[in-house]
Amino acid sequence: MNNPLPLGQWLNAPRPDDTPVAWLDDRTWTLGQLRHDVTLLVDTLRQQEGERWALCFENSYLFIVALLASLHAGKTPVIPGHSRVSLLEEQQPLFSGVLSDRSLDIDGQLIVVASRHQTIARWVPLPEINENRFVELFTSGSTGTPRRVVKYIVSLDREARLLADRFGERLAGCSVVASVVPQHLYGLTFRIVLPMAMGLPLHAAMLYYAEQLAALPHDRHYLFISSPAFLKRLDAELAAPPVRMLISAGGMLPWRDVSTTVGWLNIWPDEIYGSTETGILAWRHRVEDNLPWRPFPGVNFHQEDDACRVTSPLIHEAEGLQLDDILHFDSEGLFS
């Protein structure tokens, strides 16, 4: 799929029901099953008065069910950044109820989401998702107080388009595995939105250890979504899995860890620079230690005294956002 599907068309676009969406161990979820599961949850959510629903999931397929059902039902998905019961109870004013794949012991509304192992005999497209709909994410911020970040669906779609234009050919035929959670924007974008937009099957569980990565079946080629925290713990003594492409974000990737990764997987990592507030800003194919960052198309940096302001198609505010990082630009617009 060269043209990424916008989120509102993940279900409604004319595609075969047997299109694989996600897998876990020996089980595969298809588009037909996703359509069935989302339709059931949409019907349930329409009967609820609450507008804002927190998504707390370990299974990425069921996360997608909840995300799509919330939006198609006209609700607002809230991603609190965790699934800890004590914190959810403290944050209850932020949402009307909780959608989860587990029976959480919390006060208030809880809907446990499951897959019914069924498809719909005759698919009736769900109501369109209004382009003004959005997802709310909460980050801890520097003070530890939850900070609300709004991500409009149109911005998520534009982000998928930028990534498809940059990496699309290399992603063809890949299955997506990840060591990051969809409870943060990086995981939401790369583990959920990108594979769904590109029609790439995704692994429904998170990889916590290098041993899990090494144990992946060799009948697939993988796009591995990871972070410096995971890559520094790789064990080169393990058998290397067939990873075709590696993306890292969430911090600086030390050169020694790049070298270890290349020695094991025989591929150079692609790094992403950005933040929850800004979305993706720049990338680099890390074949050298001090390689500069290259901005994505439409991303513009503006120097303001000692600070830097950025505008981009992904930033809703017309005036852009100010960055905390100190960036040094060369004559070609690349930076370090």
Predicted feature residues:
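AMP-binding/adenylate-forming
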Residues: 93-103, 150-166, 171-233, 245, ...
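Conserved AMP-binding/adenylate-forming core of the ANL superfamily
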Residues: 8-9, 17-47, 151-154
